[in-house]
């Protein structure tokens, strides 16, 4: 926002156009869906001091798959990025990508420092990770719009859905009398975008929609 000498706004532009003001404004079903796909224990209070930037089992599994890939061994590729390191990557790494092991370590260190800036109890920092991720996850680019960032704009651009309506449908405080079919469609669209972020340029293109639908079906049963 640009202000004049009287502090009156003269120009205002918000990008992404649809975003969550804070963690508490995110519908619980959206949070639960993200955690189900990415990290089911991220917001657990069992270990209040946990570092959300590091998931060692996931990290070592990803490292082993990279070794297997280098040796031309068959196997499914696994990613080692936590939500916290993904946010660091989108915001600060060149082109939003990880080009080297050194860059991955830098992301982990940066995300770790950020996780403890509010104190040794990281629950609030972990909530901020979820909030930042949903507001900034890159979801390819669309003709006539440009780059798409965040779940809200993704719903609007890729599914022509009203983000506010989707939020209402998936907020258990507000959806007691909504149509279940409409609610199911909203949840499916949200889950599809959470899956699509792995290869957004492919899954959100016409050629990749069939594969995206198949993966979405495997998560919603």
Q: Model-derived features: where do they sit?
A:
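Solvent-exposed coil/turn segments that connect beta secondary-structure elements
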Residues: 5-7, 26-29, 37-40, 92, ...
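Short beta-strands and strand-coil junctions in structured, solvent-facing domains, enriched
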Residues: 21, 40-44
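Acidic helix-start/capping segments at beta-turn-to-alpha-helix junctions
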Residues: 28, 45-71, 80, 105, ...
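Hydrophobic/aromatic-rich, well-ordered segments within soluble, folded domains that form packed cores
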Residues: 28-31, 124
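Non-catalytic, structured segments within soluble enzyme domains
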Residues: 75-221
């Amino acid at each position: 926002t640009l202000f004049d000498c009287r502090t009156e706004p003269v120009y205002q532009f918000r990008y992404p156009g649809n975003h969550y003001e804070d963690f508490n404004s995110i519908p619980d079903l959206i949070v639960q869906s993200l955690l189900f796909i990415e990290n089911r224990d991220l917001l657990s209070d069992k270990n209040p001091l946990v570092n959300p930037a590091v998931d060692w089992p996931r990290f070592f599994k990803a490292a082993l798959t990279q070794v297997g890939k280098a040796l031309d061994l068959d196997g499914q590729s696994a990613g080692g990025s936590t939500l916290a390191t993904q946010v660091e990557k989108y915001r600060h790494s060149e082109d939003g990508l990880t080009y080297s092991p050194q860059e991955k370590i830098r992301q982990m260190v940066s995300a770790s420092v950020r996780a403890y800036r509010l104190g040794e109890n990281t629950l609030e920092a972990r909530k901020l990770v979820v909030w930042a991720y949903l507001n900034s996850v890159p979801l390819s680019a669309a003709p006539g719009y440009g780059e798409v960032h965040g779940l809200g704009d993704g719903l609007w651009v890729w599914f022509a859905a009203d983000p506010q309506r989707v939020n209402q449908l998936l907020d258990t405080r507000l959806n007691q009398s909504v149509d279940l079919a409409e609610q199911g469609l909203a949840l499916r669209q949200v889950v599809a975008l959470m899956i699509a972020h792995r290869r957004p340029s492919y899954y959100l293109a016409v050629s990749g929609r069939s594969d995206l639908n198949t993966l979405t079906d495997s998560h919603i049963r």
